Amino acid sequence: MGRLLIVNGSPRASRSNSRRYIEYFLQNWKGAADQYAAVSGGPVSFELYTDLLLVFPLYVDGVPAVLLPFLKTLAAWDGTPRPRVHVLVNCGFLEPEQNQVAVKMVRFFCKRYGFPWGMTLRIGSGEAILDTPFAWFAHRG
């Protein structure tokens, strides 16, 4: 990977579990990375990035509405090469499979607009796991 843009797609951005997962990720990430809070909006220079990591909570079996303006801007960008899109999605349900519909939405978006697909991490019990004896599972390296 070259340069990574990490997009926090949570409506609670600075107070979210998505932010905490981003912090854990960055503790192990060795490359260059920038962060962007979708709820705050603002311009993005997509040409600077080889990879995008979308981190968001599950909202009604899909992506949060605050992430949609970012995706619309990304869809309208006609630059090349296209950054590879990765997803880390978490939910309060025990089963990480609950996140599958949201992942399919992002995969469909990538296919429709010509963005290469990267990796996916679907986390269940997202609200609970970070502050329990099982927290080691979320930040093992």
Q: Which residues does each PLM region occupy?
A:
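Charged helix-capping and loop-helix junction motifs
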Residues: L68-T73, N99-M105
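Ser/Thr/Gly-rich flexible loops in soluble cytosolic domains mediating phosphotransfer, phosphorylation
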Residues: T80-V101
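N-terminal beta1-alpha1-beta2 submodule of the flavodoxin-like/Rossmannoid cofactor-binding fold
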Residues: M1-P81, R112
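A short, flexible beta-alpha/helix-coil linker loop
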Residues: P11-R12, N90-L94, S125-E127
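Short, solvent-exposed loop/turn segments at secondary-structure boundaries
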Residues: S16-R19, E97-Q100, T132-F134
